[in-house]
Amino acid sequence: MMQGNKKCTDGFSDTSSIGSVLDEADREVSNLTDRAFRSLCISEDTSFHDSDLALSPDVTSQVSGTFHQETVGHANRKSGIWSQLPSQGTEHSGWAATFQQQPKYVQGEEKYPKTSPLPTPVQRRLEVPISGLRSSSKPISKVSSLIRSFDRTETQSCDSRPPPSKPPALKNPPKFAHPPESGVNFCFDSAFLTVRRVPAEVSNTHQGSHQSGRAPGEQESPKNPEIASHSSDSLLRTPDHVAGSFEPRYPSPPLKPATAEPGRGKEWIPRRTFLHSENSAFESWDTHQPKLRERKDIAETTPESKAPKHYEDMPLLKEPYPAESKGSPYQARANCAQEENRSPSGSQSTSGAWGARDPGSQLFPVEGNASQIDPQVKRSKAPWRKPKTGKGGTDGPPDALEDKKQPNRRGLPLYSKLNPQGQLPENGVLDMPEESNDHYNPPFNISKLLTPIISTKHVLETSDTQPVEISPSPPGQLNGYQEKESSEAQSRDSYKSKAPSLLFNLKDVRKRVKSTYSPLPLLKGFDEKTRGKLDSKQEPLSNGVTLPDGLEENPPTELLPDNVPGVLHSSTQKDPAINSRESFAVSHPTFSSPSASSQTHFCVNGEAAESNSNEKEEANGESELDPSKGGGHPDCRENLPRKHLSLKLFNRESEMGPAMAEMKPHQLENGLSRSVSQETETERETGFQSLPLNQKFSPGPLSPEEEDVFYSDSQSDFTPCRQTKAKFSTSSSDQSFASFEDQQKVCFTEGPQEDRKSHVSAGDKQRDETAVEKEESQQCASRNEHRGVDEQRQEEIQRKAQGVSGGRPRKASAEDLSARGSWMGADKDTAHTHAKDPTPLPASTNKHRLFPIKDNTLRATPVIKPIILPLLRTVSSEDSLSSGHQENELPKQLWGEDAGGLSASESQEMPNTPLSNNDVPGTQHRCMVCEDVQEDPVHTAAQDETSQQTRKGSFSFLPPVEEENRMKPSPDTAGEGLAQEKSKSADLGKLGVPQRIPTIALLPDDLEDSPPSLPQHTYWEEQGFKGHFLSAPRAGPSGRRLVPSEAETSPNPSSLGESSTCSPAASSIWEEASQAAGEHWQRQEPPGPNPWASPGPTGLTRREDMTHGLTWEAEGSDPSDFRALSPRGILLADAAEKPEPPALLEKAAGKPPAVPPKTEKALRRAKKLASKRRKSDQLLEKHTEAWEGKSFTEDTQGTERRPVSPGKGPRPRFPAIRSLPPPTHRHSVSCGWEPTGRRPWGPQSLTPLPPYPATQKVLQDPQSGQYFVFDVPLQVKIKTFYDPETGKYVKVSVPSSEEASSEPPLQDALAAPYLLYPGFRPVPVTSVMPLRCSSQLAAPTFLRQGSGHRPQSSQGSRLQPPPERLGESTQHASGQCPRGPSHSPEKESAEAPRLSIISTDDLEDFATEGVS
C-alpha cells in the first residue's frame, strides 16, 4: 500500500498533469480515440489487450481508485492470487499475468515484486508500453497512443494499444498504482475493465484470454470481497457499488470523476460515450454487427453453439440450455465464476451476491447483454443510441449510462473474464467452441464489450441512471419511488428495476431490432400481446401452462417460455413486451429444458435465486432481451424469462422493498420471492412500462430489497445463475400455470389482477399488492395471498380456482406441489402460476393498479410492510411447511389489509367471506370469474393456501377443511363451488381455518362444551395461528364482510374476531358476536352457510363453516381433524402446517430468524415498533381493558408492525395464551367472551381492528370471559396493544392483573395469532405458549412450538386439547381461569418466563431485525 500510495499520489499528479497537459478537448479526443480504438481493437481482438489492460487500470482507477484504494490494496493482495491464478492456466496465466502486470505496472513497477508472477513476457511487454506511455505519453500518448493504437488496433493490439490505453492507465494507475495492491486491484479492475474491453480480449483470449479472463476473473474472485465492494463498482457486479460508487459514478459522468479523478472520470465518460456513441465504437459495432447477427442467429439456432460462440453472450443461454447442467453448469460455471466471486464476496452479500450473481449469471447475462444486447445494439447501435438519446432523460444519463456501460464494460467483460475464469472450467468444454467462436467472436466481443456497457446501462444504469434514462422511467420512477419507498431492498432492485427501464429503452431498440432481427413469432407475440395480451398471452401461456399443469418438470419447461414472454414483456415493458412474452410463451418449447432447470434452480435457490435472478435476469433479461428481440431467441427466452422474472421479482421485491420484511418473506419463501418475481413480473410486464423506474427507483432499495428479498442473499450469491434459471422457470412455470388458469380466468382476472398488480407494483407494491391485490386476490386471491407469495399463490389459486373449474390447473398445482414435492417446487409452481398469471395480467392493469394499491398500502406500509414481509418471508421460508405459504399469504394479506390493503386484505379475506362476493366482485368483477374469483379470492387466500399447502403437501388437510368449510359455502357458490371449494376450502382450510378460528363457534361451544369447544377453539387457535395470519386476513375479510353483515355475521364474526380479531370486521364481529354471545355464533352459524351466498352472510357462513368446522373439530375429532387438517388439526397438518405456523409465528412474532431487518428503515421500524410495543405494553398495562379494545384493535394495526408487537406483545401473550388459551381462551371464549371481551374488544377491536385485522387475534380471558384482541405479531409475553388514540403501541405484560384477564387472552391471541393462532389452540397455547415465545423468537422455536405444541393444539385441540386443554384448562381454567389475571401471570411465571425471556428479547431483537 505504501508504494501504492506513493504511486497513487504519483498517479494523481500524473492524472492531474495529464488533465492539465491534455486539455479538455485533448482529453476528450483521447478518450474518444481511446474508446474508438478500443472499439476497433475489440473488433480486432489483438490490439485491445494492452489497451484494455492499460485502460482497465484507468477505468479501474476511476471506478476503484477513489472507491477502493484500500480495497484495491486488498485486491492487490489478492492480485497475487490473481497473478497466481493466471499461472494456473497456461494461456490464462500468461494473459492474467499480462493483465495483472500491465495494471500492476500501471500501478508501478514496484508492484511486480509484490506480484512476482506478473512480470511475464506479456506483462513486461505491457509494462514497456505502460512505462513508455506513462513516462512519455501521459499527455500525448493518450491521443497519440490511442491514435497509434487505432493505427495498430487492427494490426497490433498489444503494443499500439497499450500506449493509448497506457496513458489512461497511467492517468488512473498512478493514482491507482499508488498502492501496489491497489494497483493489483486496479489490475483486477483492469481485468474488469479489460474484461469490459476484454470482449475483444475475451474474443482473442477467450482462446487465450480465458487465461486473462480466468486470471481477471480469479483475481476478481480473490479480490471479490473487495471487488464486491469496489470491483463490484467496477464490475457489473456493481449492484453494491452501483448503490454506492456506481450510483454516483453512473448517474452522472461527473460522478465518475467523483469516483475517480475528474479527468479520469471525464475520460471514462467520453470513452464510454465514445464507445457507445462515437463512430469508432459504432463502427466496431456495425463492423461486427453482421457477425453479431450471424452469431446471434447462430446462437438462436444453436444455443450450444451460441453459448460457445456467444460465450459471453450466450453463457446465460448456454448455461440454461444445458438443462442437464442447468443447475450445475449454469451454477457450476456460474459457481466457478460466481463462487469465486461469492467466496470472496461472501463478505459482501450484496456486492458479493451481485458479483457472485453477476459473475456467473450476469457474467452470462451481462455477457449475454454484451453479446445479446450487443447484437441488437450492434444491429441497432443507432437504435441503441437512439433509445439512449430517446430515453427521455437519458441524455445526461447517457453519459452516465455510458459510464455505467463502461464500468459494466469493465465489469461485464470482466464477467466475461470472470465467466472465463469461473466458467472456464465449464468453458473448458465451452471454451473450445467459445474460443473458436471467440476467435470468430472478437467482433461480437466488441459488441459484447459495448453491450456490457449497454448491459451495464441496463443493469448498472438500471441501478442509477436508468430511472433517468428510461422512457418508462417516469411511470417506472413513480413505481420506483413507490418501490424505493417500499424498500431499500430495491437498492439492488434498482439495478433490476432499472434494467427494466433500460429494457424499455432497449425494448424500443429491441423492438426495432426484434422487428428486424428476431423471429417473427416474437414480433408476432409482441403484437399479439399488445393487442391480445390477455388472450394471446393466455394462449401461449396456455400452451406452456398445460404442460406445467400436467407436468412437474414440464411446467418449468413450458413455463419458461411463458416466462420468456413475461421476461420479454419485462424487456419490452411496453406492449411489445406483452407480445414478446406472448411470443415467448409460444416459443417456450426452446426453453423447456432450461426452464425446468431454471425452475429447479429457482426452487433450489429459492429467493436467492429470485434475487440473483432478478439482478442477473435484469442484466440477462436486458441483454438477452436484446437477443430475444434480436437473433438470440433461445437465449432471449431464457434470459428474457430471467429478465422478466428479474423484473417481476424485483418489482415485487421493489414493492416488497418498502417492507423489507415483505421482501424477507420473499426471501423466506421462494414462492414469496418468486411471487415477487412473478408479481414483479406482472408488474414488470405491465408495471415495467410504468415501473421501469420502479426497479430503477430501486437503486437504493434494491440492495436492501435484494437482501430483503433474500436474507439468503448469499444464497443469491451462491445460486445466481441457478436462481436466475429458477426464476425463469419459476416465472415461466407460474406464467404457464397462471396463464393456463388465467386463460380460464385471466380474461376475467387479468385486468383486475393486472390492476391490482399494477397497484401492487407501486412502490408499496407488496402492501399495495396486499391491498389491491387482496382485491385482486378477491378476484385472484392467489395473487393476493402473499404479495410475493400472494402473487404466486394467487396465480396458483387462480390456477387452482380455475383448476377447480379447469380441474387440471389446480390439480397441476397440487401436482406441481406434490411433484415439485418441496415447498420450493410448490412455490415454484405457484411462482409459475403467478409468473404466468402476472405475465398476462400485469402488463395492462399493473400500472394503474400499481399506484392505487400503493396508496392503500402506503398508509402503514413502511413499518407494516417490512414487518409483514419478514413475517411472510419467514412464512415463505417455511413455506415448505404447509402453512408457511398460506401464512405468508395471510401476513401479506395482513400487511395488505393492514397497509391500506385492509380493504384489500379484507377484500381478500372477505373474498373468503362475504367480502369475497362484495369486494371480490367489485375487485373481481373485472375478472369474469367474479364470484369464482370472489370466492376465488377467498380461496385465493385459501386456495393460495391450498395451493401452497398442496405444494407443501399440506393440501391433504386442506381438502378436508375445504370440504367441511367449503362444502357449506360450496353449495352456495355452486358454480364457483369447485374452484371456490378448493380455493375456499384452501381458504377455509387456510384462511377459512382462520375464519373458522374466528368463527370459533367454540365460544358458544366452549361455553357449553368447554372440552370439545376447547379442542375446537384450540383447533381454531391452532388454525388461528396460521389462520391468524391466514385468518387475520380472513378476519379482515370476515371483519370486512362481517362488518358489512355485522349483525348476521356477528356470531361468526365473533368467532372470526376470536381468531381474526385482528380483522377490522372481526372486531365488529367480535363486538356483535359478543352481543350475540358465544352461542349466538353457533346459532348464527347455520345462517352462516346461507350468508355464504350473500357477501355479508358469506363471511358468516364461511366463519360459521369455520365455526361448524370448529365445532366439528372441537366436538368431533374428525371435524377437528379436518379443522386441524386445514389449519393444523392432523399431525400431518401439524407437521406440515406446524412448521408454517412457526414460520408464521416466526414472522409474526419475531420474524427474526428468517427475516432480520436488513435495511436501516426496517431496523428503525423495528426499533420504533419495539419502543411502541413497550409503550403499548405500558399503556395497556394501564389501560388493559379499555386499551385492549382500542389498542388491540389498533394493535392489529400495530401488529401490522407485528414484529414490534411480537417482540414485546407476544411475550406476555405467550404466557397468557399458554395457560389462558387452552382453558381460558377456549373456556373464556365460550364463557365470557361474548359480553365481556367480545363486546368491549369487539367494538374496540372493531374500530382499530379494521386497519389491522390480520394481526389481531381475539383471545378470551378464562376468568373474565372477556375476549381480547391480540395482535398476531404480539405473541410474546408482553402484549403489545395499539393505542388508537395515541397511535402508539402499548406493550402490556400478560402478567398484568387486568391484562391477565383481558390481555392474556389477547396475548393468547397474539400467541395464537403467532403460534396459538395457528389454531387458536388453547392447549397448544398451553404447550405452545412457552414454545411460542421461543418460536416467535426463532423459527426453530416456532417450529418446535408448531410441531410439538401445534400437534397438541391440533390433536390436543381436538383430541388431546380436551384433556390437555381441559387439563390445562382445568389447571389454568380452574386455576387461572378463575383468576384470569393470575392465570396470565401464572402462565407468565411458569410458561411466560421463558416466553418472555426468549420472546421479549429475541422477539424484540428479531422484530427489530426482521419485523421492520
Swiss-Prot record:
GO terms for cellular component: Z disc. The modification Phosphothreonine is found at residue 120. Residues 285-299, 306-316, 482-496, 525-538, 632-641, 753-799, 826-837, 1176-1203 have a biased composition (Basic and acidic residues). The keyword Lyase does not apply. Keywords: Cytoplasm, Phosphoprotein. The keyword GTP-binding does not apply. Residues 1401-1412 have a biased composition (Acidic residues). The modification Phosphoserine is found at residues 328, 473, 813. Expressed in the heart and skeletal muscle (at protein level). Residues 378-389, 1164-1175 have a biased composition (Basic residues). It is found in: Cytoplasm, Myofibril, Sarcomere, Z line. Its main location: cytoplasm. Residues 202-212, 343-352, 670-679, 687-697, 712-722, 904-921, 943-953, 1047-1066 have a biased composition (Polar residues). It comes from the Eukaryota. Residues 135-145, 587-612, 728-741 have a biased composition (Low complexity). One of its GO terms (biological process) is cardiac muscle cell differentiation. Residues 161-171 have a biased composition (Pro residues). InterPro entries: CEFIP, DUF4585. Residues 106-177, 202-443, 460-500, 517-848, 877-923, 935-1255, 1344-1412 are annotated as: Disordered. PANTHER family: CARDIAC-ENRICHED FHL2-INTERACTING PROTEIN, CARDIAC-ENRICHED FHL2-INTERACTING PROTEIN-RELATED. Interacts with FHL2. Plays an important role in cardiomyocyte hypertrophy via activation of the calcineurin/NFAT signaling pathway. This is Cardiac-enriched FHL2-interacting protein. It comes from Mus musculus. The gene is CEFIP.
